[in-house]
Amino acid sequence: MDRDISYQQNYTSTGATATSSRQPSTDNNADTNFLKVMSEFKYNFNSPLPTTTQFPTPYSSNQYQQTQDHFANTDAHNSSSNESSLVENSILPHHQQIQQQQQQQQQQQQQQQALGSLVPPAVTRTDTSETLDDINVQPSSVLQFGNSLPSEFLVASPEQFKEFLLDSPSTNFNFFHKTPAKTPLRFVTDSNGAQQSTTENPGQQQNVFSNVDLNNLLKSNGKTPSSSCTGAFSRTPLSKIDMNLMFNQPLPTSPSKRFSSLSLTPYGRKILNDVGTPYAKALISSNSALVDFQKARKDITTNATSIGLENANNILQRTPLRSNNKKLFIKTPQDTINSTSTLTKDNENKQDIYGSSPTTIQLNSSITKSISKLDNSRIPLLASRSDNILDSNVDDQLFDLGLTRLPLSPTPNCNSLHSTTTGTSALQIPELPKMGSFRSDTGINPISSSNTVSFKSKSGNNNSKGRIKKNGKKPSKFQIIVANIDQFNQDTSSSSLSSSLNASSSAGNSNSNVTKKRASKLKRSQSLLSDSGSKSQARKSCNSKSNGNLFNSQ
């Protein structure tokens, strides 16, 4: 007995192991079968809920059957097959389709009333072959127009759209027949023109779209010469969608004119202008900075009577004013007093109004010269902390130094140059000439301990006196830098002058006028290296010497 029991136990254990070894193979087969079924029928998956609707494709049996019925009805009414789906879908919906849809809606409402209000409509839709009312209309058009726009269907993916346009298996669906690209092109046509076209041919109301009208419509862009084709065909979408009309003709109906009117707010219009349109902006010049620069080159006149002294500090800190009579800039009374233009000098105790501007351009001319191209004597010297600044890392101390420590700013702040506080000797930068200031003779005195810049010059005083004559003699483009005041042109020019005067003394009274003219032409330029007192003394001594030489020669 014990042997039999042990034998049975061993048999059952071996059988269990055999079944356990066979079990994974059955599970794998089930998984592969399920995956195969899901991969094959993933596009034909039927939901158990009857309320879910499946949007048809051009290859579905419902859509194909409906199109076959539609073609059968149209062929029965029109034996000559003069109706075109292109004109039907793009311009006017057919009247018979609207009537058929209304009849179908009435029949379905009667069926729902006959079934009773207790039964929900979801239970009644057990047949999946039944089609919806809006099965051929896109959802956006359903929300806007209801069921008034037939013959529209939904394509689920771009691959289906490509196959639908090119590789359609059915004979009735191809690129030239009911493409979804042509169905949204619906335009409201002239109802009066449509009525005229129908009343002219009362016997052919069903044959509204004939072959002649269709050919004229497609060939002449809706502009038919014959009077019988006028009416609904005179207003076609082809003349409005033409790309040549859209891009090449600046008509008032072009989309570029209406692009700015899409947004009613100024902020929206600014955004639209910043984004830009695909159309050319011919009237807008992209180089407005050069235009402003050319306008700023005009001469400056003094018109101190028209401006009060109260507004003198606030004028020309914005855009310079212009007079009505002459298109010239107006100078303030402060300019006449200080003999310095406010275009080249900022007001004291004023915030930095400069900064990066989108219209700033780089002018590679003789006006703006970089600091590396100047002479060694005109390069600004650093302050007492120059050794510490140069030795240490610039990136570590850049933000601690302040704005006055930046040596090469594109728009330097002039407040530091005009500041009266002499407690801290800051780095002085030569003031760059602004737009229109072509005669700024600014320089740096390297000998003076205060390391300041002298702004008064001979040309600046001449500019403040009145308007410069355009036809006059142009000033010299070079400047004499004087190293010693007492020996101004003594070795070369004075000796040549005395020799010329001695040679011309025997000529008589006729040559005396020439020497006077020559002596009057020898005008010394104002020295930037001396103070005002030394300048006046040097001028007096120079005049006395020249007068003495002239007196001796005479």
Swiss-Prot record:
Keyword annotations: Activator, Cytoplasm, Nucleus, Phosphoprotein, Transcription, Transcription regulation
Q: Where can this protein be found?
A: Cytoplasm; Nucleus
What Gene Ontology cellular component terms go with this record? cytoplasm; nucleus
Q: Name one GO biological process term.
A: G2/M transition of mitotic cell cycle
Main localization, broad class: cytoplasm
Where are the residues of the annotated region Disordered? 1-31, 98-117, 410-475, 493-554
Q: Which domain of life is it from?
A: Eukaryota
**Bias kind Polar residues: ranges:** 411-427, 539-554
Which residues lie in Low complexity bias regions?
98-113, 448-465, 493-513, 525-536
Q: Which residues carry this modification: Phosphothreonine?
A: 319
- Annotated GO MF terms: transcription coactivator activity
Q: Basic residues: which segments have biased composition? A: 466-475, 515-524
Supply any other comment: Present with 779 molecules/cell in log phase SD medium.
Quaternary assembly: Forms an activator complex with FKH2.
Protein name per its UniProtKB record: Nuclear division defective protein 1
The organism of origin for this protein: Saccharomyces cerevisiae (strain ATCC 204508 / S288c) (Baker's yeast)
Q: What is the lineage of its organism?
A: Eukaryota, Fungi, Dikarya, Ascomycota, Saccharomycotina
Recorded name of the encoding gene: NDD1
